[in-house]
Amino acid sequence: MLNQKQTDCRFGGVAFAAGEDLSLKTGYLARLNAGGDLVLPQGAAEITPYVLTQGADQGYLCGAVPLTSAGNCRVKLAGTCEAGDLLVAKGDGRVEAGVSGGEALPVGTAEEKGVDGQAVLFRPAMIGSVTVAG
């Protein structure tokens, strides 16, 4: 019989220890490392399912929001974008305007015009596919 209890599942904001100094990285994309700590990505192809909402020094709790198409969020922009542009991972936790099919991982769609350094409003979206070797 299927156990339908979901009492250990969380929706909304989460807190994890910072795996590196994230004190000035609010609004950046992040991922969990093997130790279960939040860290910035090391490249544009890494999957980053969180946006930092409260940075912290290494080892301290920081806040994050999981990316979901059910709601928009703000993330740091590198360069400029127009509303409707596809935003892709830059590889350092920021996003930039890009195209589908490039090497960078698509993250979502800009919902407003943005300038460099702005926390741009965007709608996360599952775009593209990932090939699993094996």
What are these regions (language model features)?
Residues 1-134:
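Glycine-anchored, exposed beta-strand/edge motif detector
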